[in-house]
């Protein structure tokens, strides 16, 4: 009888424990399943024919929501905006193309395709027309600045607001680092070999991301090693050196862009990485000189500030676009 009683008590104890475990495990399982559900606005990866070229782009968010058109920098692609896609697509329609010669878009032969900022801006304007994007907020990073400002001057009626992230529209914004690059513009033949060596090197590709940030552990090395691989593919040396030579035309156009901003006083948000090493730290205030009501935010990042400050930037963008 004692043995039977002991067995009964053990059985009740085991039963009680199993009930408790079931009670505690159910919410965990439910929570786990909830995490596995598809997001409401997944990113789509598409291509579209524009001017005889296959243009790759990322898209997410409801198409009837305000559109955010994101223009990438060098030597990046639309991939750089992935951190914003996952943070903003619940409320906004995000579209980020790869320029010709970048990312997953076509890389036409430089002997047959003019790699100039005028030409890329023209293709990007035609891209927006092909997608039916008639109104958008323009988000411009690095090369996105000269591409975007050309798009603005061609079709100012399409632009609702501007977001500038580490992109330059003032001569002083280039800073002392651009002395050797100006030498390339002055004499391409004498300086092209040195420029290519520097532009395509792993050290320079890494420096664009890390900049002066002392917190190296925050930076994912895959971001610059992937870009380094991309830069060392066939045609890239010719494509990038052509485009970098044409960068001199951006400096020539700065007064036009500044005049447009001073006249139109657009809604303007400037986001700048405090560890930016490619451009001069005076540039954000130069924008505010043109547009006194511009919002300026210095964030905890470098030239590619989304690498380390995506949460901060997403909050800033949400507040700006309300």
Segments (PLM) and residue ranges:
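N-terminal secretory signal peptides that target proteins for export/translocation
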Residues: 1-10
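Bacterial N-terminal signal peptides
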Residues: 11-23
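Flexible "cap/lid" subdomain of the alpha/beta-hydrolase fold that forms the substrate-access gate
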Residues: 31-46, 50-55, 60-67, 95, ...
């Amino acid at each position: 009888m004692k043995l039977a009683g002991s067995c009964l008590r053990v059985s009740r104890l085991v039963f009680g424990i199993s009930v408790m475990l079931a009670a505690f495990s159910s919410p965990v399982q439910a929570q786990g399943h909830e995490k596995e559900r598809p997001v409401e606005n997944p990113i789509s990866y598409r291509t579209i024919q524009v001017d005889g070229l296959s243009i790759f782009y990322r898209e997410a968010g409801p198409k009837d929501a305000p559109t955010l058109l994101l223009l990438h920098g060098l030597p990046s692609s639309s991939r750089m905006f992935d951190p914003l896609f996952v943070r903003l697509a619940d409320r906004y329609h995000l579209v980020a193309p790869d320029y010709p010669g970048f990312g997953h878009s076509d890389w036409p032969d430089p002997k047959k395709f003019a790699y100039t900022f005028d030409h890329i801006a023209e293709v990007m304007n035609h891209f927006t027309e092909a997608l039916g994007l008639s109104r958008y907020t323009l988000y411009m990073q690095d090369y996105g600045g000269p591409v975007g400002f050309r798009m603005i001057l061609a079709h100012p009626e399409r632009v609702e607001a501007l977001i500038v992230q580490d992109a330059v529209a003032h001569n002083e914004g280039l800073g002392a680092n651009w002395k050797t690059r100006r030498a390339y513009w002055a004499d391409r033949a004498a300086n092209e070999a040195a420029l290519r060596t520097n532009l395509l090197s792993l050290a320079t590709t890494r420096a664009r991301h890390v900049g002066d940030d002392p917190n190296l552990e925050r930076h994912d090395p895959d971001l610059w090693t992937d870009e380094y691989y991309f830069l060392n593919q066939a045609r890239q040396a010719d494509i990038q050196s052509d485009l970098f030579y044409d960068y001199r035309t951006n400096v020539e156009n700065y007064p036009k862009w500044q005049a447009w901003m001073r006249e139109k006083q657009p809604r303007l948000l400037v986001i700048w990485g405090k560890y930016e090493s490619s451009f001069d730290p005076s540039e954000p205030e130069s924008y505010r000189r043109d547009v006194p009501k511009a919002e300026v935010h210095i964030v905890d990042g470098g030239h590619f500030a989304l690498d380390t400050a995506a949460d901060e930037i997403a909050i800033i963008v949400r507040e700006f676009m309300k």
